[in-house]
């Protein structure tokens, strides 16, 4: 049985997650990420999500943290028209590999966001640790810093009696 599970896990990881398989929070996170991406001034063309490599949502007291890795490809439309259904992916259009970390509060209020979408040729040059650090900051957005207890956070020592 174990021999079957490992190849299955590897195959599922290679196939990726389809948009239809995303949870409601993950779909909302993807929508926020696409809106944020198309707001940036350097982006002139509309991009369309072509695949979702991984999607994880984690509940926290302040809301849901969504971490997405997905790919975008340039379309034939300008960026202001990115939501239009007639925008088709250009076969030779630029491709981007994105990391999005979104913290959604109650009533889909966005508490924090990080959207990083370098062009696919630049992906290897970007330091992953920097994006992970920023992603952790987004994950902690809206949380009470005193709501978690970590071992060693408080240390008390009892004085020895005087002799």
Curated annotation (Swiss-Prot):
SUPFAM superfamilies: Cystatin/monellin
Keyword terms, alphabetized: Chemotaxis, Differentiation, Disulfide bond, Inflammatory response, Secreted, Signal
Any one of the GO BP annotations: positive regulation of fat cell differentiation
Keyword flag Secreted: yes
Record InterPro entries: Chemerin, Cystatin_sf
Gene Ontology terms, MF aspect: signaling receptor binding
Signal peptide: 1-20
A GO CC term attached to the entry: extracellular space
Keyword Kinase: no
S-S pairs: 77-87, 98-117, 101-135
PTM comment: Secreted in an inactive precursor form, prochemerin, which is proteolytically processed by a variety of extracellular proteases to generate forms with differing levels of bioactivity. For example, the removal of six amino acids results in chemerin-157, which exhibits the highest activity, while removal of seven amino acids results in chemerin-156 which has slightly less activity. Some proteases are able to cleave at more than one site and chemerin forms may be sequentially processed by different enzymes to modulate activity levels.
Superkingdom of this protein's organism: Eukaryota
Propeptide: 158-163
Intracellular or extracellular location(s): Secreted
Its biological purpose: Adipocyte-secreted protein (adipokine) that regulates adipogenesis, metabolism and inflammation through activation of the chemokine-like receptor 1 (CMKLR1). Also acts as a ligand for CMKLR2. Can also bind to C-C chemokine receptor-like 2 (CCRL2), but with a lower affinity than it does to CMKLR1 or CMKLR2. Positively regulates adipocyte differentiation, modulates the expression of adipocyte genes involved in lipid and glucose metabolism and might play a role in angiogenesis, a process essential for the expansion of white adipose tissue.
PANTHER family linked to this entry: RETINOIC ACID RECEPTOR RESPONDER PROTEIN 2
The protein, known as: Retinoic acid receptor responder protein 2
């Amino acid at each position: 049985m174990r021999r079957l599970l490992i190849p299955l896990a590897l195959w599922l990881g290679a196939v990726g997650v389809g948009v239809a398989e995303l949870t409601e929070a993950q779909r909302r996170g993807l929508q926020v990420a696409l809106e944020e991406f198309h707001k940036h001034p350097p982006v002139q063309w509309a991009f369309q999500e072509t695949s979702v490599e991984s999607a994880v949502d984690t509940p926290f007291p302040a809301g849901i943290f969504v971490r997405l890795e997905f790919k975008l490809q340039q379309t034939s439309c300008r960026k202001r028209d990115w939501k239009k259904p007639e925008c088709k992916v250009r076969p030779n259009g630029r491709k981007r590999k994105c990391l999005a970390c979104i913290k959604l509060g109650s009533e889909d209020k966005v508490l924090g966001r990080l959207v990083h979408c370098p062009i696919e040729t630049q992906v290897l040059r970007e330091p992953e640790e920097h994006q992970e650090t920023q992603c952790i900051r987004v994950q902690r957005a809206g949380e009470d810093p005193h709501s978690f207890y970590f071992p060693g956070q408080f240390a008390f020592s009892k004085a020895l009696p005087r002799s």
